[in-house]
Amino acid sequence: MPKSDDCFFSMDNLFFSSPDETENFPVKEKSLDWFLPPAPLISEIPDIQELEEEIESYKLLGKGKMPRMLTSNLKIINEDTNCISPTQKIHFSYNVHEQDYLNLGGSNNNDMSHVAGKLMYGSSQKYKNHMGAKSPSARSSPGDTKLHDVAEDRQGTSAFKKRLSRTCDSEHDCDYADGSLNLSSHISPVKLTQTKISKENAWTCSNSKQKRQYSTNKFKANDAFSASGIGKDIFKAPSFPAASQPHDIQGITPNGLGSLKAVTEIPAKFRNIFKEFPYFNYIQSKAFDDLLYTDRNFVICAPTGSGKTVVFELAITRLLMEVPLPWLNMKIVYMAPIKALCSQRFDDWKEKFGPVGLNCKELTGDTVMDDLFEIQHANIIITTPEKWDSVTRKWRDNSFIQLVRLFLIDEVHVIKDENRGPTLEVVVSRMKTVQSLSRDLESASPVPVRFVAVSATIPNAEDIAEWLSDGERPAVCLKMDESHRPVKLQKVVLGFPCSSSQTEFKFDLALNYKVYSVIRTYSDQKPTLVFCSTRKGVQQAASVLVKDAKFIISVEQKLRLQKSAYSIRDSKLKDTLVYGVGYHHAGMELSDRKLVEGLFTSGDLPVLFTTSTLAMGMNMPAHLVVIKSTMHYSGGVFEEYSETDILQMIGRAGRPQFDTTATAVIMTRLSTREKYVQMLACNDTVESSLHRHLIEHLNAEIVLHTITDVNIALDWIRSTMLYIRALKNPSHYGFSSGLNKDGIEAKLQELCLKNLKDLSSLDLIKMDEDVNFKPTEAGRLMAWYYITFETVKKFCAISGKETLLDLISMISSCNEFLDVQLRISEKRILNTLNKDPNRITIRFPMAERIKTREMKVNCLIQAQLGCIPIQDFALTQDTVKIFRNGSRIARWLSDFVAAQEKKFAVLLNSVILTKCFKCKLWENSKHVSKQLDKIGISLSNTMVNAGLTSFKKIEEANARELELILNRHPPFGTQIKEAVAHLPKYELEVEQIARYSDIKAEILVTIILRNFEQLQTKRTAPDFHYATLIIGDADNQVVFKHKIMDSVLLKSGNWVKKIDVKRALISEDLSINLISSDYVGLDIHQKFTVFYFGPRKFVNETAMERSSETDISHSDYSGRATATGSSKGMATCKKPGNRECHHHCKNKHACGHDCCKIGVAQKPEVKESAMSSYLSDLKSRDAVSSLPLAKRLKIQMNKSQNVDLKEFGFTPRPSLSSISRSEYLNTPELSILEQRNQHEIYGKVQQGPSEYRDKEVLGVNLELGNEVWDDFDDESLIEVMSLSADAEKMAASGFGDTRDSSLGGSKLPFQKSSSRFQRDNSNSFASSPGKPDAYLRDCSRSSFGLSSVAEIPQRAENASLANLQERRPLTLSPVIERMCFAHSKKTPQSPKFKEVDIFIGNSGSKKEIDLSKYYPDDAAEEMKALLGIFNGIF
């Protein structure tokens, strides 16, 4: 008698019944080949309702209602059978002499349930009853004939039934297992053929044929269905040794009765979702009724690889059946713990549910928040807990969240994970809260949210079911143990000795030499997958294995591996691949990874080493999985794998699509062996980790107004898994084990109150005396941007003067980057990026070498912003991850600083840094073209090398030249120019309103969009592009901040705002900045000086610098913001007494110039003797020189042809009367141009001579006779006159308007105009109506060494020269006189001509001497000639 536990069948197997031992098999046998037809299409399978109606017509149902479900031992859903190729045959020894016909009408009524189309596994007793129906009397029963006639009349009604009735004529390839089968059909009289299978021919495909086992031509389960003997013949087969029985274990229950649901129970329009199989497997069939015919919450715990995904698809089908078309107000959320699973599910469901009419959208960390607009129209949202947490923190603003009807949770056992678990727990609790609040707010009862959760095998699944209750009753919980696993998995834990002195690194290296013995013992010459903890460990282990072992591979397989190795970029991988060993990790090139995955899937690669990337969702055909070392490097330290990681890795073994049996081996230390034995036995209870991360989630709920006081906070805690587990296991959460329910609730409430006080300490929430909570703006920003509490705490301590470098350093140390690891192999590249004299390095190098995670993050951020290429692929991946989180932190920081009313410098730098993260460029980068479409880093570098460093230059360039530069065909250049032309072009105007006060002023700021008419038709910038206006004063206080949308400017072309300004203590200067949100190169930075009544600390001047493309470094901006002023300005020349200024303002009462309103005040007189100034100048020039005096004298004497110095002595001549200078000492001081705070540019300007101004006048008489000039070589003064020609060239080359001044407004004693007429003409030129105000340029002093340049009209020059010659005819020698007149004739008649005062050369440095202050016009030239004698001497 066969036993019930012998009934193990392959899912592709024909349904054989065990032979009757009383039967005699004749010796004469004939070999017969049996072929199976291809599987019928799903559309050909009739509905169960149709079959039931047909059975009713036979009147065979009797009293009992026929069950709706079909039972079969066919292959489970979504998993292909493990079988041989379709070309292989199974040979049966067929006895032609023994044929018996069985009429269904003669069967026992107690065993007639099979007639309803139900395929049943029967117990031994039922087997006997059924076999006993084959008596002759039963065959000759009158009922048989009647049933036969009826069946013949209906034979042509169904193509499907005709197909089932045909003799099998196709090849069938499958494995047979032990057991007996009873198969009956109601369609027609079925011939029962007793067949004996010879032992030598029974099996043509053994398990040794592994290549076929992993063939890509996988046999479908519906092929077995059509070939199962329903058509005509039923075979009786003897028992076989169980070779492949584990994958048929489903369908067997302890009672001997199991049933499988048919796909035909699904409505016809949804059957294509399950088109891969005709029947659901045992686990899915057990959950079928609860999922498809009820709306209750559902939790299922089943082994990995048991087809749990179909559980979700059944729940979706139920919702589609209930909700009418067009499904607009219905959303389904699928949540998985990792992005790899989300991506896999998205690709799968997009194909399955797309034809049905559902729109799928993936929402993970790789997607930006802009995708929220797209998920508004998505029906199925596939996301991670972290991403859905950030979305639902604004659920009151996002109405689509209230449209969620079905919430699917994959891998719900992740709730016990320290990092991911709290987020998963809070998200599910929040979705329950959304449902309850919606029920309270709406009068009509809203449609509830259904929760369906899937978990690996865990001991306390009832706790999860209780947590997912609908408020009235817990969720339905279905627990399936390992006995129902489709593929039997053998789990082995191997412990290896590890001494206390041995590091984890050395232990991991030692395991590399033990991997081969594990593979040889457990792989059974089938594909093996080895998980390693690090990327470097993967390469090392593969290299060791290649040296130790040679895997037997066929010649064809070796040729395929060698051919694939040619395409591999990784040289080490190329060496190991030809020996049948490969490796795979996230740091490899994508092409290499795909190629290795393909080789392993096809079976050509026997061994694959990998990191955790393949453990999460990748379905690889591994018979053996080896976890080499249970320690991995995370967060800077070695720690044990979590249970979730272990289960995911061993879940890669024995996938039903590829294998029948599988083995998982864990290699660990002896000390931890027992821990993993218990873990694999699924004895670890799922506990909550929410109590360790409660503070961020409490803040989020307060922002959502879910929690308003302590009592409601406790109510919210009751909706979490933490509360359920704390009641059952209080000691795990730090509570006393003897506490009752009230005591535990009090402890939880105390825990909440502690975290709430921490939030209140940082002003994230407001608490009153009644312990009521209200969120603050800072708390809202923390919740909305998903920022950790520690990060907020770090930035709350900012001083307000932080530079860009400071902010980047603070961001790099945030907890959001804890998952970034610093690998030893990366340090060389990072140090090269940081400091390298031969390469382009980062903008703000770090003093030390790269040693920490924070330094790595800092370096990669700066490298990306500086457009420095990073060659290492792993570092490139890390950079993408860093910028994803860093951009979010920077956006939060700019909003946080603005909300906290922090200082101006840190606000401006945070806004600029936000834009830098978005554009991935520095704010002063020359690679502005990289922001345009079709321009990458390579083309951008080409444009920078060609000098196209701004949008203005690109727009002015010729389109054909652009194409030549970029090596592109037309119309590429035209497209680039059009893109630039349609960028917004801002213009900023500031003026002061004529209402003055000593502490307050009013300014009018106007922002003009110059090309707003052009932007009406086309825009390059996105629709939501805006510019931020930030105004700050010299005290580092924010005066004004506002975001101006482009859409506002497009309406009228401008935006005007009146702003009240309070007087600053340090200076009246304002810094006005317009920062684009999306583009580098559009910013405007401008200075404006406000006028106030009352005493002033600084020289009153208006300084305005306008730049459409910023070129200033904001890293030291806070220093400039608080300085006395850093702008370039120009003060007009002044006459004695009050007078009107010469600004050409249209409305002098409304402009920002204070001199336009009150006039120009008279400068104080400076009484200083000529000799004192002269000696001061000599001292200054002598101090500047870098050469010793003796050496300089020697050089100059050689140049002067050894002139005797005695000839230059000062000889008093009584014949020349002394000229009194006292009458000239009261000459009013002439105002000059001032340049302030430019030490870094004008570092060589000397301030020493100014100390002589107030000294007593020296009564020294210094005169020279005419014979001094007669003896002096006139050629020594040629250099002086050539300098005047240089000034003329300077004016013609575009520097004619350049005016310079001394440092900090201090006036050197000789920095005056050369004559009185020059002074008068200088004033007249400044007041010319045709000349606008000029701005200082940096190049004047650095290029020419000038400190004062006065413009002289030609007519004044001619008159002055004639006057000078008439008054002092004997002052100059004839040579000098001819030179002066020749120079005056060559001067062009241009108002831009500059006449430069005479200079005295001194070892490369020239010093200007202006004597017009101390002498009358006729005596000034005499003194200049005197000083020219000493050219080069001092």
UniProtKB/Swiss-Prot annotation:
SMART domains to which the protein is assigned, alphabetical: DEXDc, HELICc, Sec63
Polar residues: bias regions: 1311-1327
Positions of the UniProt region annotated as Disordered: 1110-1130, 1294-1333
Pfam families registered for this protein in UniProt: DEAD, Helicase_C, Sec63, SNRNP200_wHTH
EC class: isomerase
Taxonomic path: Eukaryota, Metazoa, Chordata, Craniata, Vertebrata
Domain Helicase ATP-binding: 289-476
Name this protein carries in UniProt: Probable ATP-dependent DNA helicase HFM1
Cofactor field: Zn(2+)
